[in-house]
Design a protein with these regions (language model features):
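Short hydrophobic segments within beta-strands
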Residues: 6-7, 75-77, 116-118, 125
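Glycine-rich phosphate/adenosyl-contacting loop at the front of the ribokinase-like
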Residues: 1-75
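Conserved phosphate-binding/catalytic loop of the ribokinase/pfkB sugar-kinase fold
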Residues: 99-104, 114-143
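Short, electropositive alpha-helical surface patch
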Residues: 80, 85-92
Length: 143
């Protein structure tokens, strides 16, 4: 059986924070907020990265199916940057075939800051980057 998902290719950037960090940055605990590149960089400059992993809801589901034994693939758009490389390597490690046209993009690879407070609540700040710009030209139908 083969299953292919298409979605936003997002690198999850996991950081531990306290409630004060959320308040100081006007973030609502346990919510997800779409942010631009400027806000992403502003937040990231004040954080210590714990871990980065390939993410995005569709890709996460495809990885789960792969772990259950399905032959799985994912279509999503990343840039030819460090995070884009990390994203494709992460899917490969999970035995997910990744279909994409690797090229330099104007926008960087999409990222989601996952801010974890001491009570294990997650607050997410997502910058879609190039993931939000996927189009027909990015999909290789012959693959």
């Amino acid at each position: 059986m083969k299953i292919i998902g298409i979605g936003n290719a997002i690198v999850d950037v996991i950081c531990k924070v306290d409630d004060k960090f959320l308040i100081n940055n006007k973030l609502i605990k346990s919510n997800m907020k779409l942010i631009d590149e400027l806000e992403f960089n502003k937040l990231l400059n004040n954080l210590k990265i714990e871990e980065t992993v390939s993410g995005g809801s569709v890709a996460n589901s495809i990885v789960g199916l792969s772990q259950l034994g399905a032959k799985a693939g994912f279509i999503g758009k990343v840039s030819d940057d460090d995070l884009g490389q990390k994203y494709s390597q992460g899917l490969k490690k999970e035995n997910v075939e990744y279909f994409y046209n690797k090229k330099k993009e104007i926008l960087p690879t999409g990222t989601c800051l996952i801010l974890i407070t001491p009570d294990s609540e997650r607050t997410m700040c997502t910058f879609l980057g190039t993931a939000g710009k996927i189009n027909k030209a990015d999909i290789d139908i012959e693959a």
